[in-house]
Curated annotation (Swiss-Prot):
It comes from Mus musculus. It is a peripheral membrane protein. This is Pleckstrin homology domain-containing family H member 2. One of its GO terms (biological process) is negative regulation of actin filament depolymerization. SMART domains: B41, MyTH4, PH.
Length: 1491
């Protein structure tokens, strides 16, 4: 036990004590330090307490000050709270009242809806009742018609029996028959006038019937018998005349017996006809010509036309134009029908009308000698009274229906009645025997059952002679023109004619007075006729008289619309030479019109279709056909059209459409000559397939086909109908199917280099070979699709969708790849759009060879280290041995291999194909793309750590590799440079004097992205990265990054998933309280607008960048603005954004200025030329305003490299381009004013014919509008000389602005002084007159020129030409193309638009191919030397006119069906050119549309 205790005894306690004392000292030192620190801390806290107490004291003092202020203002907290509480209660009570009002209004709205529903049901019931009543009434009339025919037949038998008895009593004729003969003869004469059923005027009597009326009774009864037998044999569709026979008698016997006696007297004296004409004056003369005579005639005649008599034959179209009809075919609305003097029917009518007076005189003289003079009998009065009462009973129930609607009354007349050809080149000159028709009241009881059962908007099937002349009534109705003065009546007979107003549209529109009844059949009235007229006729309205000053202007204008012969012709010839040699720079034109030089258009289906964007060359459509014989003569129009009817057994046998069965002559009838009505053409399922090879359920594609196509010839650009046969890899064509055993007229070799391009029209295709380009047109889109499919099969194309156009949308990636499938390889151009991979033959091809749907497909890279290169070798193509392979394996399909030549391209394709397939694979693409894919998988969770990754945040250093996958190393290098450019833009401070630095940086960066679309994703990702870190307000970097991002998204948008990332980024940063957030909101608006209107084409302009950087664009919905100039010198500032199109821009402009839409007003937006020349360019509606401004700036800098004018920008002008006379009624005051100044611009530049006197009158009118009253210089003591100088200066300005240049050039000082004096006299005569009156008179005078509103182009015909070698004006107007003399501006010839076959560029000239009426030369090609920019302008202008009328016709056609409600006879269906044939019984009909 001692051993363990020994160590305890060995402890050195002293040392341990020393150690413990040392530790104690350390503790003491530490304690002292702690005390010191604690003391310091306490002192610091004490100081803080003192400061806090001082601040609290100060705050307490401030509180006291504030309380004192509040007390001083008598504002206490309790009172303010009470007041706020009361205000809150008041607001709540008001809100409750508003809610109650809203609920009451909602209840009332529901009640109104229920009331409207009930009213609609009532109206439908009434409509059904009316429909039933009309059906019953028609049935009754039909039964009555049958009864009348039976009665007529019975009376005919009785008449024959009486005739036999009369022959037996021939010897006792004088003693037994003389007394009743007078009464019976008078009775027959009373009704005999109405037996004629000629389509000539109803008052013209057949010579045979006149002789029968004046002869004995057997002859009369025999004539009636024969006529009734002829009527009984007419088809059912013409029974309306039989039905209205008795009613016509009832209606027309309203004339008194005095008028009947007077009729006989007039027949005895004048032969029943008007002087010097076979047509009566009363029915066919205008109100102006008749004067008081036309208004004094009774209401006897209300029918519009009647059947043609046997002697008259089928007369010309002499029916009324009150209710014009239009077919549903594709003839345009502007195709006005005119007389054709070569028609035998019209010659027959003319000769018959010339012979009628002499026959009538002879027969009447003979009848008068036999029947005697005393023919007044009491039975005549009784019959007249009886039938008059019956007529009133019949017509009382349909008085409203008999009243024509003023909306339906205007007649359709050509704007240029004496100039436009009917079928091409022949002038529109009506025959001398044609009288002007008058509007007449239709007869409601003349509607036949067949006409009512048929839908009124359907076109009728026509006979061979009158094919295509049917018209739909409402679709051809034009609104009335505004009331203007007719200057043609100034020199009329009598004092009253001087001041008469013309209420029609123009000189060709027949006036109609709703108070004037149609003239009676008794057309030969003398001066005593008004005394014997019916008393119920209203008095003649008073004639309008003009003031003396207005009459003086109209008198000058009557003969003033012509060019004075005294002006300098040498100057005009010099200007013409300058115009021909004047050409604009093509840079800006190509930018505006998308590289369109001088396009070529053709007219198909009434619509102008572009078939080429470049001018035709000599070999543009060459063939061996041009050298073949042209001995085949062209069939006549009637023969050609007769084959197209459905009754043709040949057409039915072949099973082709109407147009396919048309003429097989050398020159085909244009496709717009055939109807497009669905019931006229045959159904598609009945069409006989012309393919010779069976499709075998789609497995074996056909390689042979035959059928009719239209081919454009080479020398004369017109369409020729040929029979094409595709066989053995060649396309042969013949004149007809019967010529296939002969040598073909030409052949087209189909090889691998051939390409098939579809034109703008659905029926036109362009077949381009190595040598020539062929333009082919099929009869229908379905037939064309069959041809394209077979042609592509022949070209060894495996088309998954051969007729699919190039897909819309921006491709994510595109390039030339090798596609391998099923062991076959092919070099194709691939394009990834959305989730579909399209592949084409080449980059320019518009038709994809096939497509590959990638959604849920398996996309991966293939390791081909074990494969041999021979497996992937392609025919004719050399591939590197180091190419890469991507396999695309869609669901339920075999795999497709894509061979790619470079690694960068492979990575780009692999990433985009993987994204398109919707794969969740995040191992493809760059690091940035993988992070975006991860964010997409978690739907952008805000709390995710991925957002904090450095790759997604702002960085001050540059990047070493692109953020996105790019297909080439050069693009990767460019992406790194692009990031540096963005850094320079963001980091450099914006300084207004040095703003051009930022402008150049932004334009260069965005221009690179527009040039290389692959970089668009890259720059968007870079800007998202650089704007993700929010900085303090005094650091401008990120703010300028937002500005650059705003410029970027206004131009283009990235693809998915970067677009999703951009939208999420903008959404997270949108905040209206900060400037960054405001720019984020502005970027959101830009993204929406870009998605709506598509990407831009040009980089941002200087104005756009300045507005974005300096003018806070987030404060405005339209951050940019530009002035639009008008022809009167004023301008309107219009706002727009980065994606605003011209169409949207014009809608805003029209809304601000109070003008109509461009489709109605014809106004368009023009820009000046950046070269500074006096040229203008019309802007199309789909171009963006910012692109126009940018392209204009680029062109200006390139054309004027030495000048750098930052303030010079594009000048926009808004003026009239298309003038429609039918739209003049709705012109606003602003439009009239602008038309006034635009007409003045034509006048001062010599594009409007008027002599010096009229030019001075017009200048005075315009001075009154522009300046106001002329201030006469008074001699005052202050300064008489000063006033005189001021007046002379004003007159000088007026002469320079409003007087033609050619009349004032070369004038001496004395002549100018006299001109100033004459102008001042005329100007002072207008003192006190308003601007509206002066504008009205100015436009009234200007519209008297037939080519008002037309655009004139200087041209020189190229020899050989039928127009000679002199310079001419080409006037493009609403009805066609007219050629005017250069000096006098007189009309040379005109061509309607339906006669224009082809027009556009031909080498360096302007070409027009027109159809003529010559059999030897059915078409004519006219060439004109013009400036290049003028060729483009006139081509686009003609196409715009044609397409505008086509669109109007389509609109009117759709609106026509419900509007055809007014009852009519068959007579309104007859037009001026000829009567329509009866409705075919085989035509399918619909139920009547009565309401």
């Amino acid at each position: 036990m001692e051993e363990p205790s020994e160590p305890e005894g060995l402890i050195d306690w002293k040392e341990r004590c020393v150690a413990l004392e040392a530790q104690l000292m350390k503790f003491r030192v530490q304690a002292s330090k702690i005390r010191e620190l604690l003391a310091d801390k306490m002192q610091q806290l004490e100081r803080q307490v003192i400061d806090a107490e001082r601040q609290a004291e100060k705050a307490f003092q401030e509180v006291q000050v504030m309380e004192e202020k509040l007390k001083a203002a008598n504002i206490q907290t309790s009172e303010s709270e009470t007041r706020l509480y009361k205000k809150c209660q008041d607001l709540e009570s008001v809100m409750q009242e508003k809610d109650d009002i809203i609920q009451n209004l909602a209840l009332r709205l529901e009640e109104q809806k229920q009331v409207r529903i009930q009213e609609a049901k009532i109206i439908e019931e009434k409509a059904a009742k009316i429909k039933e009543w009309v059906t019953v009434k028609l049935n009754e009339l039909e039964v009555e018609n049958q009864n009348l025919r039976f009665i007529n037949q019975t009376q005919t038998e009785e008449i024959r029996a009486i005739q036999s008895k009369l022959q037996e009593l021939q010897e006792k004729k004088i003693s037994c028959v003389s007394s009743p003969k007078t009464s019976e003869g008078q009775r027959n004469l009373t009704f005999g006038c109405f037996l004629s059923r000629a389509k000539s005027p109803p008052c013209v009597v057949r010579c045979e019937e006149v002789s029968k009326m004046a002869s004995n009774e057997p002859e009369i009864t025999e004539g009636r018998c024969v006529e009734e037998m002829e009527i009984a044999e007419k088809p059912a569709d013409n029974q309306v005349q039989e039905n209205s026979r008795s009613q016509r008698k009832l209606h027309e016997t309203s004339c008194s017996s005095e008028q009947n006696q007077k009729t006989r007297a007039s027949f005895a004296m004048d032969g029943g006809t008007s002087q010097n004409s076979g047509v009566p004056v009363s029915d066919w003369s205008s109100d102006e010509d008749d004067g008081s005579k036309g208004r004094s005639k009774s209401r006897c005649t209300s029918t519009l036309s009647s059947h043609t008599s046997e002697e008259g034959g089928q007369c010309g179209r002499l029916g009324s134009e009150a209710y014009l009809t239009a077919s549903d075919d594709s003839s345009s609305i502007f195709e006005e029908e005119t007389f054709d003097g070569n028609r035998p029917e019209q010659k027959k009518l003319c000769s018959w009308q010339q012979k009628a007076p002499w026959k009538a005189q002879g027969n009447l003289a003979k009848g008068r000698s036999q029947s005697g003079v005393k023919e007044q009998d009491s039975s005549s009065d009784e019959l007249n009274k009886k039938f008059h009462s019956q007529r009133l009973d019949y017509t009382s129930s349909s008085s409203e229906a008999n009243t024509p609607s003023p909306i339906l009354t205007p007649a359709l007349t050509p704007r240029y009645p004496n100039s436009l050809p009917g079928k091409g080149g022949a002038p529109l000159v009506p025959p001398p025997f044609q009288p002007p028709p008058k509007l007449r009241v239709p007869n409601v009881f003349s509607i036949s059952v067949a006409l009512t059962k048929r839908h009124l908007s359907q076109p009728q099937l026509c006979s061979d002679r009158m094919f295509g002349t049917n018209r739909n009534a409402i679709s051809m109705i034009r609104p009335l023109r505004p009331q203007e003065t007719d200057l043609d009546v100034v020199d009329g007979d009598g004092a009253e004619a001087v001041n008469r107003m013309d209420t029609g549209c123009d000189d060709g529109l027949f006036s109609y007075d709703s108070q004037d009844p149609p003239p009676c059949a008794d057309d030969q009235e003398n001066s005593e006729a008004p005394k014997k007229a019916p008393c119920n006729k209203p008095p003649t309205p008073p004639l309008h008289r003009f003031p003396s000053w207005e009459s003086r202007i109209y008198a000058v204008a009557k003969s003033g619309i012509r060019v004075s012969e005294a002006f300098n012709m040498e100057h005009a010839n010099k200007n013409s030479a300058d115009i021909l040699s004047y050409s604009a720079a093509s840079l800006y034109t190509s930018l505006i019109y998308k590289n369109m030089t001088t396009p070529v258009y053709t007219t198909l289906k009434g619509k102008a279709t572009q078939i080429s964007s470049s001018p035709f060359l000599d070999d543009s459509s060459g063939s061996d056909e041009e050298d073949s014989s042209r001995s085949s003569s062209r069939l006549s129009e009637s023969d050609a059209r007769s084959r197209s009817g459905p009754s043709s057994p040949r057409a039915m046998k072949r099973g082709v459409s109407d147009s396919s069965a048309a003429s097989e002559s050398d020159y085909a009838i244009p496709p717009d000559a055939y109807p497009i009505d669905a019931e006229c053409s045959q159904p598609e399922q009945k069409l006989l397939k012309t393919c010779l090879a069976s499709c075998d359920n789609g497995k074996n594609e056909p390689l042979e086909k035959s059928g009719y196509l239209l081919k454009m010839s080479v020398r004369v650009k017109t369409w020729k109908r040929r029979w094409f046969v595709l066989k053995g890899g060649e396309l042969l064509y013949y004149k007809s199917p019967s010529d296939v055993i002969r040598k073909p007229q030409g052949h087209i070799e189909l090889s691998a280099s051939c390409s098939i391009l579809r034109g703008d029209n659905k029926q036109t295709v362009q077949l381009a070979t190595e040598k020539h380009t062929y333009y082919l047109t099929a009869d229908s889109p379905n037939i064309l699709e069959e041809w394209i499919k077979v042609l592509q099969s022949v070209l060894r194309v495996q088309a998954a969708n051969p007729l699919c156009l190039q897909p819309e949308g921006k491709p994510a990636v595109k390039g030339l790849l090798t596609k391998v499938k099923h062991g076959y390889s092919k070099r194709v151009w691939c394009m990834l759009v959305g989730k579909v991979l399209y592949y084409f033959r080449n980059q320019e091809d518009k038709f994809p060879l096939g497509q590959l749907k990638l959604w849920e497909a398996k996309v991966e890279e293939v390791d081909r280290s074990c494969d041999s290169d021979e497996d992937y070798e392609t025919r004719g193509c050399y591939l590197l041995s180091t190419h890469y392979t991507i396999i695309v394996h869609p669901k339920d399909q075999g795999p497709t291999y894509l061979l790619i030549g470079s690694k960068h391209e492979k990575e780009a394709w692999l990433y985009h194909l993987t994204v398109a397939a919707g794969s969740n694979n995040i191992n493809v693409g760059s690091e940035f793309e993988q992070l975006v894919c991860k964010l997409l998988n978690i739907e952008g969770e805000p709390s995710s750590q991925i957002w904090r990754h450095p790759m997604l945040c702002h960085s001050k250093e540059g990047i070493l590799s692109p953020l996105t996958t790019l297909p080439s190393e050069a693009l990767q290098t460019e992406a790194i440079k692009l990031f540096k450019t963005c850094q320079l833009f963001i980091n450099a401070a914006v300084d207004s004097p040095a703003i051009d630095y930022h402008i150049s940086l932004a334009q260069s960066a965005l221009q690179v992205c527009l040039t290389h679309p692959e970089l668009q994703n890259e720059i968007c990702c870079q800007l998202i990265k650089q704007t993700r870190r929010r900085q303090l307000q005094n650091q401008p970097g990120p703010l300028q990054g937002w500005q650059l991002l705003a410029l970027c998204v206004g131009l283009f948008l990235p693809h998915h998933p970067f677009l999703w990332l951009l939208q999420l980024h903008l959404q997270r940063n949108a905040d209206s309280r900060t400037e960054f957030g405001k720019y984020a909101i502005y970027c959101q608006r830009c993204v929406e607008r870009t998605q709506q209107n598509g990407d831009r084409e040009a980089r941002p302009s200087r104005m756009e960048i300045l507005s974005t950087l300096l003018r806070n664009p987030y404060h405005h919905s339209r951050p940019f603005s530009i002035p639009v100039h008008f022809m009167n010198g004023l301008y309107q500032v219009v706002g727009f954004d980065a994606s605003t199109t011209v169409e949207e821009f014009l809608n805003t402009l029209n809304q601000d200025t109070g003008m109509r839409k461009p489709a109605q007003s014809g106004f368009a937006l023009f820009t000046d030329d950046p070269s500074g020349r006096d040229l203008e360019h019309c802007l199309q509606g789909n171009i963006k305003i910012c692109d126009i401004i940018s392209k204009w700036e680029q062109a200006s800098k390139e054309q004027q490299p030495g000048k750098c004018e930052g303030s010079r920008t594009v000048r926009l002008t808004y003026k009239n381009r298309l003038y429609f006379s039918v739209q003049a009624r709705g012109e606003t005051d602003r439009e009239k004013t602008l038309l006034l100044y635009q007409t003045n611009d034509q006048i001062i530049n010599g594009l409007f014919p008027l002599n010096k006197d009229l030019a001075l009158e017009m200048a005075a009118l315009l001075a009154q509008v522009d300046i106001g009253d002329f201030e006469r210089p008074f001699s005052t003591p202050a300064g008489p000389v000063t006033n005189q100088c001021k007046a002379n200066q004003t007159l000088k300005q007026v002469i320079e602005r409003f007087y033609p240049k050619r009349y004032r050039e070369g004038c001496s000082e004395e002549q100018l002084r006299q001109l100033y004096q004459r102008l001042s006299t005329k100007w002072m005569a207008l003192r006190g007159h308003s601007a509206a009156d002066c504008i009205r008179i100015y436009l009234t005078v200007a519209r008297k020129w037939p080519f008002f509103g037309a655009k004139l182009f200087f041209a020189k015909p190229i020899a050989p030409s039928s127009l000679g070698n002199n310079c001419v004006w080409l006037a493009v107007h609403e009805n066609g193309l007219s050629i005017l003399e250069y000096t006098s501006m007189r009309l040379v010839t005109s061509y309607m638009y339906k006669g224009l076959m082809t027009f556009g560029g031909y080498q360096e000239d302007f070409m027009v191919v027109v159809s003529t009426q010559s059999k030897d030369r059915p078409t004519e090609k006219l060439l004109f030397a013009m400036a290049k920019h003028k060729i483009l302008e006139i081509t686009l202008l003609i196409a715009s006119y044609i397409n505008s009328f086509h669109q109007q016709k389509t609109t009117f056609h759709h609106l026509s069906a419900p509007a055809l409600l007014s009852p009519r006879t068959q007579a309104p269906q007859a037009r001026v050119m000829g009567s329509q044939p009866p409705l075919s019984n085989s035509r399918p009909t619909k139920g009547p549309t009565l309401l």
